């Protein structure tokens, strides 16, 4: 967690949750929740923690109670987001890259059939690298290779980067890789820039079940994209939903086409909640 960002959030947070409705306080086991996902194959809300925590995939009820804690047979280098496909398989984004120097970026596929296992769960590793990174780390003006956001769509995984370039924090580059085991070079699709400030960092993403709406999360707002052409998700209309609440928001997913789940990390006893947001 970036100390500057934490200080900024603590100074600007309040007891009000703005446009967000609190559903539950997250349990202590998810104090550093970094990814959230739902799908039509389970009634549970799936969540993971940030890097440095146990390699576990948690299944929660809608009131925030842990119903499953699955042990994943892979290191949590820096797990940052969750996604799922129409078959119910879960994908874990192990691509957090604060220093822009990782050479082992990966997405871990957890089979839907293994979600009822009691022992350690094996995964399929989908490794990738960015086509335009050749130094690890690059110079400060080229720190564009961190990521905390992705989703699955039409047999591909779409990854949204997080800029660590001062004055360009709100920029995100969209990349695509095949959703299959192996080593891949990511394909650049397009870019979007919301604002230059640090609280515009993109920290999570999701796509609606019908594929007609995507959402990007930052500390202070949700960006909704509609009317786009095929998979150029930034080609349509972009609508910002201010949250009127600033915290370290780390994860977002669709509950249904007009309702979102959002979570934030607990810091100094503040936040660490599961929220609901209506965007219709």
Residue ranges and their predicted role:
Residues 1-21:
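Bacterial Sec-dependent N-terminal signal peptides
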Residues 16-280:
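Sequence/structural signature of beta-propeller domains
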């Amino acid at each position: 967690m970036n100390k500057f960002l934490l200080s900024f959030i603590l100074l600007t947070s309040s007891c009000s949750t703005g446009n967000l409705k609190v559903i539950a306080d997250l349990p202590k086991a998810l104090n550093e929740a970094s990814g959230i996902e739902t799908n039509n194959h389970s009634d549970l809300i799936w969540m993971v923690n940030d890097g440095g925590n146990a390699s576990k995939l948690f299944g929660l009820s809608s009131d925030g109670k842990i119903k499953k804690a699955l042990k994943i047979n892979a290191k949590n280098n820096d797990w940052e987001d969750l996604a799922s496909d129409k078959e119910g398989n879960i994908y874990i984004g192990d691509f957090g890259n604060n220093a822009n120097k990782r050479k082992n970026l990966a997405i871990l596929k957890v089979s839907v059939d293994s979600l009822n296992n009691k022992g350690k769960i094996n995964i399929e590793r989908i490794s990738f690298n960015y086509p335009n990174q050749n130094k690890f780390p690059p110079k400060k003006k080229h720190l564009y290779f961190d990521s905390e956001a992705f989703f699955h769509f039409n047999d591909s995984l779409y990854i949204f980067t997080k800029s660590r370039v001062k004055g360009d924090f709100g920029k995100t580059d969209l990349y695509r890789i095949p959703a299959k085991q192996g080593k891949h070079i990511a394909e650049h699709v397009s870019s979007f820039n919301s604002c230059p400030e640090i609280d515009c960092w993109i920290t999570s993403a999701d796509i609606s079940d019908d594929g007609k709406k995507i959402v990007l999360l930052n500390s202070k707002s949700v960006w909704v994209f509609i009317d786009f052409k095929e998979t150029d998700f930034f080609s349509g209309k972009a609508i910002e939903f201010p949250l009127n609440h600033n915290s370290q928001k780390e994860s977002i997913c669709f509950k249904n086409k007009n309702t979102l789940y959002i979570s934030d990390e607990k810091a100094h006893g503040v936040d660490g909640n599961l929220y609901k947001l209506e965007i219709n």
